[in-house]
Structures are given as structure tokens and as C-alpha cells.
Amino acid sequence: IARKFNSTYGEAFTIPEAMLDSDIVMIRGRDGRKMSKSYGNHISPDHTEEEIYERVKSFVTDRKKLSDEGDPYECPVFDLHRAFNRDGEVEVARACRNATSKCYDCKTGELPDLIADSYSDYRTRKAEISDGFVLDVLREGNIKAREVTSEKMDQVRKFMLMDYLK
């Protein structure tokens, strides 16, 4: 939208730059598709530790037999290790490739605890926040946004030759 406006009326908006980290991976859900709340295959910070454990345990892995060597990059559970178990990621990949650990162990070991621990600050903070606090933050943000956007909207109206009412 900003690019189209700028090309039509003039340089009013800054074009945002992508800020992608090459280390970020798409995390697949328990069915192998992209993890998504709409697919119902996600792990949410709102889930309890028990729910996280059950969801991780239900992930589909890539090996057919326990003796088969695995490919960690084909396994959605390894996506979770890459996101939540950075210290143990290399060892998990090695054990998968060598078939020295069972997929079930990979899912039920420390991984669910690591995920739950990473979400614990969120859950604690969420419990502390009241509805009144949220409304106060929204009001303050609204006031600040109006100050910033009123100047920008004046500039936009000028570019579009719609500032004749002043």
C-alpha cells in the first residue's frame, strides 16, 4: 500500500524492510503441516504443561521402524528441538541419524518441559495483567497514535490535494 501510494502521489510513507533471521525455521505441527492454530496442530503458550506434553507426544515422526536411521530435518519434532532445545539440538540430530534413540524418547524426554519452561514467563505475566491495565495501555497508545498519525494524515491529504478544507 505504501509503495503504491508513494508511486501515485509522492514519497509520503517509508517502505518497511524485511527483518528476517536466517536461523528462523518454519515449525511444523504434529501432523507435519505448518504449525497453525487454524489447523489445530499448534502448541500455545496458553496450554498447560500437561497439554503441551500430550501435544508433543502426539507428533508424527519420520521413521517407520525403530531400527531405521532417521533424517531429523524431515521430522517435525526436530523443528521443536531446533526452536526450544538449542543446546541439545546437535545430539538429538545425531541420535536420530544413528537410530540410537527412539522417536518416542525424543518426544517425551526433556522437550515438553523445555517448551513449557519457555512459556512460563508469558503465563505468569498474563496472570498478573488485569483488564483495567489493558484498557489503560490501549488508551495511552491511542493518544500517542493520534499525535503521530495526525501529522502523517495532514501530509497525505496534501499529497492527494485534499487539504482544501483548512
PLM segments and residue spans:
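Conserved nucleotide- and phosphate/pyrophosphate-binding catalytic cores
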Residues: 2-166
